[in-house]
């Protein structure tokens, strides 16, 4: 069984460590502060604070932050999601202490200097424009805004240029004081470094970094908007289509049956039902993929494909046919066994992607207090029955629950 080490510091910071024989250490902070934690009038604030976190601390200027790991061949980066912001580093194990010190400093001691705000806001505005110019990416955000209309989960992570240009140092500090506290974060380490050394280092660094009381994250109850269909004229060369609907939260027992369904429907394998139907047999699309998007309290699924505009109706009919196949006809024992074997193999291989596994380690521990135990996941997958798969398909893939977004 895979070894994991966990601890909690007196200030509430949770730590998780997985040993590795690799000379590279992946580590970082997963802070429970994302788009859904923004108040009204704070749209885009979580992502704005992420950008400004690299602009200076009480003891480091921006250039010192950028050079700290780079000059020893390391990497420092961050990203913002709907429910978290993750600051992560990759470094040779002999430089682990340097990475831990830097990450702790920028997460808990950033000053968000006003002199850099105007410049960085324009960088984010360019990011917004670039994103809007990529319909195959932007469509996913608009689809989620349809699923969670009028709720924080439905907001765009990047915010709007108009709102961003109003933000000040005081706004960033207020958001950070509320959310960037040890008891609202988890520190993760994946690599060849002694666990007790990490705990000692963080115990030494963090008391001075703690500067307030974090807000207890109590996200409002989430509800799904009614099923809808929206067609948007984007003037693109091909149509971009998303079809999906409500699914399960990240802790729901039925999620494993849905994971099997999703993988069979449009997972990464070239033998997925949609790839065989839309690409291999009909030649209508270059790629078609099915996704599960889960949060601790909600979740949804969708299928994306791009095709010629005159093929949209035909592709949708083929998609609906495949959904109905899962609803109307139970999997045979051989089909279910093959699906489980393929999925378990993919799960196992995914752990070999070290940085991705490290990020998943941090995010899962931050939100669920659990580690991504491969043996436990495989056991849960193998326990799923054909009857359970069919019942989940009937609930999740029901035609009257589908929301559709089309860019033409």
Positions of PLM-derived features:
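N- or domain-start disorder-to-order transition segments that initiate the globular core
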Residues: 1-25
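M16/MPP (pitrilysin/insulinase) zinc-metallopeptidase core fold and M16-derived inactive scaffolds
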Residues: 21, 28-90, 268-284
């Amino acid at each position: 069984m895979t070894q994991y080490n966990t601890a909690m510091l007196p200030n509430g910071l949770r730590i998780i460590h997985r040993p590795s024989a690799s000379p590279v250490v992946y580590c970082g902070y997963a802070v429970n502060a994302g788009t859904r934690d923004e108040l009204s009038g704070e749209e885009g604030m979580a992502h704005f604070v992420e950008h400004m976190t690299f602009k200076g601390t009480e003891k480091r200027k921006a250039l010192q932050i950028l050079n700290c790991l780079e000059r020893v061949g390391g990497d420092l980066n961050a990203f913002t999601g709907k429910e978290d912001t993750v600051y992560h580093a990759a470094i040779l194990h002999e430089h682990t202490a340097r990475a831990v010190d830097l990450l702790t400093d920028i997460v808990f001691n950033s000053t968000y200097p006003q002199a850099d705000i105007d410049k960085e806001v324009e960088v984010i505005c360019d990011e917004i424009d670039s994103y809007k110019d990529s319909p195959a990416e932007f469509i996913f955000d608009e689809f989620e805004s349809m699923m969670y209309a009028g709720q924080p989960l439905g907001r765009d992570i990047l915010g709007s240029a108009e709102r961003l240009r109003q933000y000040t140092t005081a706004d960033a500090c207020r958001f950070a004081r509320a959310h960037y506290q040890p008891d609202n974060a988890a520190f993760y380490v994946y690599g060849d470094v002694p666990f007790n050394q990490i705990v000692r280092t963080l115990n030494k660094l963090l008391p001075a970094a703690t500067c307030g009381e974090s807000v207890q994250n109590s996200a409002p109850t989430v509800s799904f908007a009614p099923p809808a269909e929206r067609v948007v004229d984007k003037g693109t060369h091909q149509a971009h289509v998303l079809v999906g609907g409500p699914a399960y939260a990240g802790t729901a027992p039925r999620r494993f049956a849905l994971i099997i369904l999703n993988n069979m429907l449009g997972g990464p394998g070239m033998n997925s039902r949609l790839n065989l139907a839309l690409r291999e047999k009909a030649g209508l699309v270059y790629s078609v993929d099915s996704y599960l998007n889960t949060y601790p309290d909600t979740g949804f699924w969708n299928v994306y494909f791009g095709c010629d505009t005159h093929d949209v109706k035909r592709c949708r009919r083929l998609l609906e046919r495949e959904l109905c196949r899962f609803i109307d006809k139970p999997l045979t024992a051989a089909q279910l066994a093959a699906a489980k074997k393929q999925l378990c193999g993919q799960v196992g291989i995914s752990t070999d992607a070290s940085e991705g596994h490290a990020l998943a380690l941090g995010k899962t521990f931050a939100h669920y207090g659990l580690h991504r135990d491969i043996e436990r996941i495989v056991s849960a997958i193998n326990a799923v029955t054909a009857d359970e798969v069919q019942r989940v398909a009937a609930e999740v893939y029901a035609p009257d629950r589908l929301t559709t977004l089309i860019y033409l």
